[in-house]
Regions:
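Membrane-interface "cap" regions at the ends of multi-pass membrane proteins
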Residues: 1-46, 50, 56-64, 485-513
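Helix-loop-helix junctions that connect adjacent transmembrane segments
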Residues: 3-7, 39, 124-125, 129-135, ...
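Select transmembrane alpha-helical segments in multipass membrane proteins
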Residues: 8-18, 86-100, 140, 201-212, ...
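Transmembrane helix-loop boundary segments of multi-pass membrane transporters
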Residues: 35-43, 121-133, 156-165, 273-277, ...
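Hydrophobic transmembrane alpha-helices that form the core helical bundles
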Residues: 58-69, 73-140, 148, 294-311, ...
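TM-loop-TM module centered on a large, flexible mid-protein loop between adjacent transmembrane helices
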Residues: 78-86, 244-302, 320-380
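Membrane-water interface regions at transmembrane-helix termini and the short interhelical loops
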Residues: 143-168, 226-231, 399-410
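C-terminal membrane-solvent junction of multi-pass transporters and transport-like membrane proteins
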Residues: 329-334, 389-442, 464-469
Length: 513
């Protein structure tokens, strides 16, 4: 085996990176907020998982053909966008995916890692000791830096971490699925069936729609392995299969977890297991689950940061971020890459940390206001996934048009019927979901502006984010997503004094390194 090949990810390591980057944070952290958003109505709760699963699965099948497109100096989503839409599309996705999507979520997952770590120690020790949110920010920053350094030093080692964590994280999920479904009427921890509809939890379609961003967050990152295309052995052959197999597994597990959770009206895996098993076994089972949840969270953060590091490397390599071209004249590519990893994380630290600590938030019980909560962080984590599912839809539609107009330009294809069914279903549902979400958000602000948006995970500290607060976060992220690539392009022309799109000419980019 060549040294270059030995440093790359094999099929199972890459599959583990994919599954590891998807399974974990979403199902462990978002299930409770999805339950809250749907008002604990079992049908809306379960259907939200099913709709999100259908969208994600068919999108993944569509991308299993799209990922056959030839490799360039770009990786994954940016490469596919370039091949289909040209240099401007390739640049836009490269910058947005690296700086906006991965940069922000990498930092947010650090905070979630802190929360699950403290919850683990509280569970293991049997004491609910105080841990302020500012401390979660500090510990979260440590985790983010650790995962970035690990992946910067060796993506191969990161692949082994993903492989181990992926196997282990399924243990509590499998236990929860079988226990919850096989014992639907057993309630040892105050559970009940969320399918028993009362006046307090009537089915509301708009709330199902409002839950979709959290669901799509749980399913998202299924294309992260594409961002590691140049790190996967026999990538052109294996990446499509990895995406399809991985998503079938994930959608199956998530749907069963959604059903199991609704049968017991428990939004957390630990709560679900505690409701099924006898009270005298709850502590031991909860500690058992906490260990695997901890490993799972670290695995997700590790896998996402692997994609983040690789994407920033691409930005620097192509001088696609302001100042990179000038800095590379004085410093090595490695030093410049480290600089932009730091700059990206610092920017998002300011955007995330300051509002989370400084903004006044109303208390859930209506007794006043408070500071320091993860509700803003949780809300911010939902919208990148929703926005990028819109990007996925645009790529699928553009590729489908190319497939019709220039059929001979498509060298490798999956079954035609399978592709078209998947492309039509996924793109249609994504469009409907995005449009319905925007409408539901506006409606929620118009009718219940100061009601809870349902955001918050382990450290909400009794505070809530209102519907209008959630809407403002969504609008802010849309503005950043749309405007920053243009601002970056303009600054490059002034600071580095060259036309960035020259670097995306076919002669310079279409030869893989």
């Amino acid at each position: 085996m060549k040294i270059q090949s030995a440093r790359k990810l094999g099929f199972f390591a890459a599959l583990s990176m994919l599954v590891g980057s998807v399974v974990g944070i979403g199902i462990f952290f978002k299930n409770a907020s999805i339950a809250a958003t749907t008002n604990n109505n079992g049908y809306a709760w379960l259907f939200a998982w099913i709709v999100g699963g259908i969208i994600s699965l068919f999108a993944a099948i569509s991308f299993s053909e799209i990922s056959f497109l030839k490799q360039t100096k770009l990786n994954g989503l940016a490469n596919w966008s370039y091949q289909i839409g040209g240099k401007k599309s390739g640049y836009f996705v490269l910058f947005s995916y690296g700086f906006y999507y991965l940069g922000m979520l990498g930092l947010i997952l650090g905070i979630f890692s802190s929360e699950i770590t403290i919850w683990f120690f509280q569970t293991a020790s049997g004491s609910s000791f105080s841990f302020p949110f500012w401390a979660h920010i500090l510990l979260g920053a440590f985790f983010t830096i650790l995962f970035v350094i690990t992946n910067y030093v060796s993506v191969k080692f990161s692949g082994y971490v993903a492989l181990v964590s992926t196997v282990l994280k399924f243990v509590p999920l499998i236990v929860a699925v079988f226990a919850g479904i096989f014992f639907p009427t057993t309630h040892n921890a105050g559970g009940s069936s969320a399918f028993e509809v009362t006046e307090k939890n009537n089915f509301d379609f708009s709330k199902l729609v409002l839950a979709l961003p959290a669901v799509l967050f749980a399913y998202d990152s299924f294309l992260s392995v594409g961002s590691l295309h140049n790190k996967v052995q026999k990538a052109n052959k294996r990446v499509p299969l990895i995406i399809t197999v991985g998503m079938i597994l994930i959608v199956s597990v998530y749907t069963l977890i959604g059903l199991s959770s609704a049968l017991h009206n428990k939004g957390t895996i630990s709560g679900l297991i505690s409701d099924v098993f006898p009270a005298n076994a709850v502590r031991g089972i909860t500690i058992f689950v906490a260990v695997f949840l901890l490993i799972s969270t670290y695995g997700v953060a590790n896998s996402l940061n692997a994609a983040f590091v690789n994407q920033v490397r691409d930005l620097v390599k192509l001088n696609a971020i302001v100042g990179a071209h000038s800095l590379k004249k004085k410093y090595s590519n490695e030093k410049v890459t480290i600089f932009y990893l730091i700059i990206t994380l610092v920017f998002w630290a300011l955007v995330i940390y300051i509002p989370s600590l400084a903004i006044k938030l109303p208390k859930k019980d209506g007794t006043g206001i408070g500071y320091g909560s993860d509700v803003i962080v949780d809300s911010m984590s939902n919208f990148p996934s929703l926005i990028f599912f819109g990007v996925y839809m645009a790529i699928i539609v553009a590729y489908s048009r190319k497939k019709i107009k220039y059929p001979n330009s498509i060298e490798r294809k999956i079954n035609p019927k399978l592709y078209w069914i998947s492309a039509i279903i996924s793109s249609s549902l994504i469009l409907i979901a995005v449009a319905a979400f925007i409408y539901s958000q506006i409606y929620a602000v118009a009718t219940q502006a100061h009601s809870s948006s349902g955001a918050g995970v382990f450290a909400d500290n009794g505070l809530m984010l209102t519907n209008i607060g959630s809407f403002l976060i969504f609008i802010t992220q849309i503005l950043i997503f749309v405007s920053f690539p243009y601002i970056n392009y303009f600054l490059i022309s002034k600071v580095d004094k060259f036309d960035l799109f020259d670097n995306f000419d076919s002669a310079k980019i279409e030869k893989a390194e």
